[in-house]
Amino acid sequence: MTTGQRTIVRHAPGKLFVAGEYAVVDPGNPAILVAVDRHISVTVSDADADTGAADVVISSDLGPQAVGWRWHDGRLVVRDPDDGQQARSALAHVVSAIETVGRLLGERGQKVPALTLSVSSRLHEDGRKFGLGSSGAVTVATVAAVAAFCGLELSTDERFRLAMLATAELDPKGSGGDLAASTWGGWIAYQAPDRAFVLDLARRVGVDRTLKAPWPGHSVRRLPAPKGLTLEVGWTGEPASTASLVSDLHRRTWRGSASHQRFVETTTDCVRSAVTALESGDDTSLLHEIRRARQELARLDDEVGLGIFTPKLTALCDAAEAVGGAAKPSGAGGGDCGIALLDAEASRDITHVRQRWETAGVLPLPLTPALEGI
């Protein structure tokens, strides 16, 4: 008689930045994000008998084959050297998430059992990323699935914190806003923690104590959706790298300059005003703040020359403005997606905007806010 195989499945939604990009990477600066109804799914099961010497087997619908890993000094090492560098690069966020959950288990006197993990993504199409936060979503889903598989009962905040630690180990410059949107779902106001502080704390006192400690700068709260506005999303077909754009900005002398200070102050005021508009149901003020956010990103682009606004993103914004809406790049810009807020009752205007987008080479994405996170 054989026992049934244990299987845990977790789904994490993608995200879009509504306002606060670039400024949010500094701890305590606010941003608004919304989770969207395309998900990444992570399935964790007991290891098959034929996995051989592998402790963990990871497969993804974005990768060519399953890759076996084994534990060595708390880290996962590729079993087959031929898979090495490519596998670690392609699966970096999944691996870091498993390792971070493993650290927590180790501190509690447990270990990660042998398992197989598979990733299925609707944040891509034909291998192309839409820019909906796939790295964040897969990290959040992996943390949740592996933790549940190992019997860890974690609060929503603890799942976010584990995902933040896993992500910061790979790149401490990322704000974690994508992780928060995937974790809580809906519309959120977000402030990033000091990643250098929390990484150092985890190395000094361990993951378990770090989960319970105060995190300077960090805040998340749910927001109501706009009352009479619909969120429209357009994809430029031009993939952008948030990490490289943010890194480029970090390398420039702009950081710490008077221009940088003005950008952060104006963006912070804009985001706080937009939060107030959402909480009071003031759609007119919200549209005004989205326009301000676009203008501030345009000023940053003019001063620093990052390439935030591509011709397609500019056309996307102009089409929405022409019917009285408000639009801007979502996230780091340079490609990927733009968002527009339009009168939800003006169906002809919405159709007109979508048609203008298509003429400009922008693909309207059939997305709606995901009300629940993972």
Curated annotation (Swiss-Prot):
Tell me where the signal peptide lies.
Answer: none
Give the transmembrane ranges.
Answer: none
Name the Gene Ontology molecular function terms of this record.
ATP binding; phosphomevalonate kinase activity
Q: Annotated pathway, please?
A: Isoprenoid biosynthesis; isopentenyl diphosphate biosynthesis via mevalonate pathway; isopentenyl diphosphate from (R)-mevalonate: step 2/3
Disulfide pattern: none
Instruction: State the Pfam families in the record.
Output: GHMP_kinases_C, GHMP_kinases_N
Q: Which domain of life does the UniProt lineage start with?
A: Bacteria
- Give UniProt keywords alphabetically: ATP-binding, Isoprene biosynthesis, Kinase, Magnesium, Nucleotide-binding, Transferase
Q: Which cofactor does it need?
A: Mg(2+)
Q: What is its EC number?
A: 2.7.4.2
Write out the GO biological process terms: isopentenyl diphosphate biosynthetic process, mevalonate pathway
What catalytic activity is recorded? Answer: (R)-5-phosphomevalonate + ATP = (R)-5-diphosphomevalonate + ADP
Q: What binding partners and quaternary form does the record give?
A: Homodimer.
Q: Which family does it belong to?
A: Belongs to the GHMP kinase family.
What does the function comment of this entry state? Catalyzes the phosphorylation of (R)-mevalonate 5-phosphate (MVAP) to (R)-mevalonate 5-diphosphate (MVAPP). Functions in the mevalonate (MVA) pathway leading to isopentenyl diphosphate (IPP), a key precursor for the biosynthesis of isoprenoid compounds.
List the protein's name: Phosphomevalonate kinase
Source organism per entry reads Streptomyces sp. (strain CL190)
Upper lineage is: Bacteria, Bacillati, Actinomycetota, Actinomycetes, Kitasatosporales
